[in-house]
């Protein structure tokens, strides 16, 4: 019996020792294998600069050409704008407009007469007159011509009108229709609908009487129910009842 007990005890001890050894060894991580040393990186070979600086000169020239081109484009753009503005602002005088009329007047002059061409200039039209004056010592024929030419200038374009904000803010006083609208709203007790705070304040300040009426609104109809008792006070004196007149005795007979 003793031998059996000792054998069993020895087996148990061996198993326990093996289990503890395997558990402790499992927690430990295997050591990484030694890494080989990194190979040296190849050195970057920088491009060797040429002895002459031709490349740099070419780049600079190219940049200069670009900037000059841009400046030319800008100048041309500005010049075009100036030309357009000058065309818009240019005012053609009547002396240029009536060149053909003056030549025609001079052509039609008969021998012994001198052409007199006069014109008046205004903002909207040019008025001109062609007359002929006899040269002293020459035969005079009656010849006179008068013409009026009106050059109508196109009317200037008016800028579009800004849309008017009806009944808004401080502009209320300026428009009569807004004032009418205010009075109507106050009369029906609707003084703040569709209006901002400034407008409501303006309404209260300018239309105090209307605002007071608006607070009450429409008078409510009396509800059906018992009438209130009359207030105590001095009773009126009873009216005298008229007595019936005595009938005459002869009437019975």
Swiss-Prot record:
Cellular compartments per GO CC: extracellular region
Region span, 3 X 4 AA approximate tandem repeats of K-P-P-K: 153-166
Signal peptide: 1-21
Tissue specificity remark: Salivary gland.
Biased segments, Basic residues type: 206-217
Extent of Pro residues compositional bias: 225-243
Region (7 X 4 AA approximate tandem repeats of P-K-P-[GAV]): 222-249
Record's compositionally biased regions (Basic and acidic residues): 26-51, 154-168, 244-253
Keywords: Repeat, Secreted, Signal
Region (Disordered) residue spans: 23-51, 140-168, 203-253
Region of interest: 3 X 6 AA approximate tandem repeats of K-P-K-D-A-P: 29-47
Predominant cellular place of this UniProt entry's protein: secreted
Localization in the cell: Secreted
Sequence repeats: 29-34, 35-40, 41-47, 153-156, 158-161, 162-166, 222-225, 226-229, 230-233, 234-237, 238-241, 242-245, 246-249
Entry function: Used by the larvae to construct a supramolecular structure, the larval tube.
Protein name: Salivary gland SP38-40.B protein
Gene this chain is encoded by: SP38-40.B
